Amino acid sequence: MTETNFTIRPLAEGDLAEWLRLRLLLWDESTEDDHMAEMVDIIENSDAQFVAVADLGDGRLAGFLEASIRSHVEDCDTENVGYLEGWFVEESYRQLGMGGSLVNFAEDWARQKGCTEMASDAEVDNVVSQQAHSRLGYSETSRLVHLKKELV
């Protein structure tokens, strides 16, 4: 396997098309318009939201991470908790330390914002994500099943 050089850095204006491409790979149930609306919201509310990217140096991004500051997070002890909203590395670039580097970068951002805790979530059946979190020092705090009922 050849060595892959990458740089972890904050999102830049020139990254929007690549960020959208990666978001569509991670959250493929959302439309491009939905993604664009969310991206605008993140950019316009950059005090409490943050995007880091894994830059391959040739105009391509291999991964990204979106983080935020949440005023309350289940099972956390403090207010204003850093939160990993979503992170993704393209399959061909996994197992190279890119995901961990993205998370470390986001944790540094949260510390700079005054946070003393970082939290995240993973789908109950997404064992790969749960294992990735665990390798980075995150521990499971609880499991939750969402329920709904139509009121007619």
Model-based region annotation:
Residues 53, 60-69, 83, 88:
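Conserved beta-strand in the GNAT
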Residues 89, 95-108, 131, 135:
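Conserved acetyl-CoA-binding loop-helix of GNAT-fold acetyltransferases
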